[in-house]
Amino acid sequence: MTLLQVHNFVDNSGRKKWLSRTLGQTRCPGKSMGREKFVKNNCSAIS
């Protein structure tokens, strides 16, 4: 759910490419938890 909200937010901000790269890293096995935390922190800072 959070990733979908982030996707919409980033898409509206015109940062779709940045999001795609971040999601690609987030989906890497073994690093998903760390990356998700990193993405959430960045989105909080951006908004």
UniProtKB/Swiss-Prot annotation:
It comes from the Bacteria. This is Protein YpaB. It comes from Escherichia coli (strain K12). The gene is ypaB.
